[in-house]
């Protein structure tokens, strides 16, 4: 594939292809991942730990789709090559316009039941006043057993007076409610 574009943001469309592109370099590793440069890490062990790595094939930090800014995939043939199941993948990665393959079509391949969950919420739960994220937290573990979709609220939009703490010495980040965060994402 001939890939060279003047806009660096277009590189984000290659994220689902990282496992395939770096297949040789990944030999001997259990997981491969994708991330953004605008993250400040705290305790990433909240997300990536022995328990989660033993139980899940994909670990991500949103509950409504794969978080392209922080996602880890088991290093096996299935997840390395899932990107090639994206419809018209060659034309999408060679088109100049970014199309967010990581959080869009690839996310739908990793988590095929998210569409069903959206429909359950839209047609049933929202009329009962049940928040979409509550429905996701209930149904994701049932419908996506091998994927940890957990919302960490790492892309804040702090309001005046809120205090967020980044403790460099201890490698920890605490939001204004006192919750520990694995990282902060500056959008």
Q: Which residues are covered by each model-predicted region?
A:
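Active-site-proximal specificity loops/subdomain of glycosyltransferases
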Residues: 1-27
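Conserved glycosyltransferase catalytic-site signature
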Residues: 12-17, 37-38, 99, 103-104
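Conserved donor-nucleotide/metal-binding helix-loop-beta segment in metal-dependent transferases, i.e.
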Residues: 41-68
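Short glycine- and hydrophobic/aromatic-rich loop-to-beta-strand nucleating segment
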Residues: 69-77
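Catalytic core and acceptor-binding pocket of nucleotide-sugar-dependent glycosyltransferases
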Residues: 79-187
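Short beta-strand-to-loop acidic/aromatic patch adjacent to the donor-nucleotide binding site
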Residues: 28-42
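Glycine/small-residue-rich pyrophosphate-binding loop that anchors the diphosphate of NDP-sugar donors
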Residues: 10, 67-70
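A short secondary-structure junction signal
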Residues: 32, 43-47, 81-85
């Amino acid at each position: 594939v001939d890939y060279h574009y003047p806009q660096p943001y277009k590189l984000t469309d290659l994220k689902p292809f990282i496992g395939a592109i770096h297949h040789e370099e990944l030999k001997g590793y259990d997981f491969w991942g994708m991330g953004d440069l605008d993250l400040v890490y705290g305790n990433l062990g909240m997300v990536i730990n022995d328990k989660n790595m033993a139980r899940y094939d994909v670990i991500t930090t949103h509950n409504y789709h794969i978080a392209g800014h922080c996602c880890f995939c088991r290093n096996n043939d299935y997840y390395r090559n899932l990107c090639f199941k994206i419809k018209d993948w060659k034309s999408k990665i060679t088109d100049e316009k970014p199309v967010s393959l990581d959080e869009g079509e690839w996310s739908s391949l990793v988590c095929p039941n998210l569409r069903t969950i959206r429909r359950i919420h839209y047609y049933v739960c929202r009329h009962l006043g049940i928040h979409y994220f509550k429905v996701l937290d209930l149904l994701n573990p049932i419908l996506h057993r091998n994927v940890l979709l957990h919302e960490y609220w790492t892309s804040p939009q702090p309001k005046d007076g809120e205090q967020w703490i980044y403790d460099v010495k201890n490698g920890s980040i605490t939001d204004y409610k006192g919750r520990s965060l694995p990282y902060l994402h500056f959008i």
